[in-house]
Amino acid sequence: IERLNKEKDLIGIFLSAHPLDEWEFEVRKLCNTTAEEMNQFEAWTSPAARNAASASIQENNDEETIEDEKEALTPNQWIEKHAGQPLHMGGIIVAAEDRMSQKGNPWGKYTIEDYTGSYQFSAFGETYLKHAALLKQNAYVYLSGTIQQRGAQFKFFKPKPIEEAEYEFSLQQVQMIKDAQKDLRSI
């Protein structure tokens, strides 16, 4: 992996191989989302951003036939389809930073990379405490979580209509890809 990291640092891409090649089968079979798709979601977390993107997508849909269902969905449709559903992503942790909040609570900021790019996410509270040992640089991990309305984890949360709500990815489970591989073999 050091050789691949040097290669990427020098020319900006992995040329001879990708660090995930050893786990390609597992990543493709177990995962239902990618870094690219999660970054697109991040651009749609606010209602204003979703409305602007929807208008642009609608213009493009009117001008051409969409063959890929993912491209045909507006941001609100994508969120409606995925909110509350399990999302699974596999990759290699390329950056890991353990931090402390102003109140003294530990949390972490991470970047995972797959075949489509990189995605930055955070872990807080019990999720951080439970999984921080796995979320280390160069670890091959399998993430599970859901798309939910921002604040949904709080006791007195009142949901808003999809058109008005802000959304976030809520990390719920982390495991090593090799352990997820065992789950795949048991199917």
Ranges and model annotations:
Residues 1-187:
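Noncatalytic, beta-rich nucleic-acid-contacting surfaces in large DNA/RNA-processing enzymes
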